[in-house]
Amino acid sequence: DAYSGEYNKVRDNVFRTNTSLAWLLNKSWITNLKFDASIYYNDNNSHAHTFYSYASEQPAVHATEEGYFMANKLPYTYFADQIIDSKELDYAASLKYEWNRRFKTVNSNLKAGVQWKATGNVGEGEYYKDPSLAPNGYRPRPYTTYPYMHNVSLYAEESLSFPVGNTMLRLMAGVRWEHLFIKGTKYKNLNTLSPRFNARWQLNEHIAIRGGWGITEKLPSFYTLYPKQEYRDIQTFGFSYNKIESSYIYYSQPYTLLHNENLRWQRNQNAEIGLDVNIARTRISLVGYFNRTKLPYKYASTYTPFSYDVLQLPDGFTMPTNPQINVDNQ
């Protein structure tokens, strides 16, 4: 903004690299083996130069420990420079095995593999060029303080197709197992098992019946498994002096999302059956399905009483023009 002096700058750079190797072995026990690996880096940086103006003094609490603290004072007018520095850096690798074979009239395709992915951020997160001008409630949370999330998965899938009289039947069954590794999380057994089954019966070139069933287990989000550090600030004392100046004492209390040792993983069950008809270049599909979610995640509040001191000036006390204030953090 040329008039106010405000401006915003954004930098967004993406780097991707990947490699893929395939071995076409065509042996009696293997058809091919494929290896993939990739690196993804997203450098995203935003800079906001913002003007602030207040009619009265504004407190700003930035304490990171529990206790009583005097709030900083923000100027009546000032420019603040907010930086959000994100540097997402992800790694991935996979090994895939495939075996195609034929037993008389039965065609079989077996796929199996292992996948690994690591996701994280090496950026500094949100910060201010001048920390004393950070707004009330701000605390630095560098992205580097959060651990990488590693996902390892194993999967297998078998597809069969064979004639049944003058019709063709296709069957597919698969299972996927995943495990998360997050350093420092309190949750154990971060693994899921997701089976599935599909079938398609091609009665003739115009009519087919199909159906499927599967279960998908879903883990909670990263910030549930590794909660963010949050803060609660409660004003316990405030006073004015020198006619236009004010000071405030706050009780600050760090907290995080509570660990639920009885938390069970959300499970989605899906089933469907359908009829596909092709007539005169027109495709008609009739599908019936059933979806059910067990143990859905939801946030709940629990209340734990705690105490803190609220102070008041004695009756008749007059605050001096330039008071010396000492705060006992405990």
What are these regions (language model features)?
Residues 145-292:
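Structural signature of Gram-negative outer-membrane beta-barrels, strongest in the C-terminal barrel
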Residues 8-186, 202:
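Face-selective signature of the C-terminal outer-membrane beta-barrel domain
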Residues 2, 54-78, 120-142, 230-257, ...:
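Surface-exposed loop/turn segments flanking beta-strands in extracellular/periplasmic regions
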Residues 3-7, 79-83, 140-144, 187, ...:
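Short, flexible coil/linker segments at or flanking structured domains
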Residues 82, 88-94, 263-264, 279, ...:
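Outer membrane beta-barrel strand-and-loop segments of large Gram-negative receptors
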Residues 1-7, 45-54, 122-130, 183-193, ...:
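Outer-membrane beta-barrel translocator domains and adjoining extracellular loop/strand segments
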Residues 35, 197, 275, 321, ...:
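Intrinsic-disorder/low-complexity regions
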Residues 131-133, 221, 326:
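Short, solvent-exposed coil/turn linker segments
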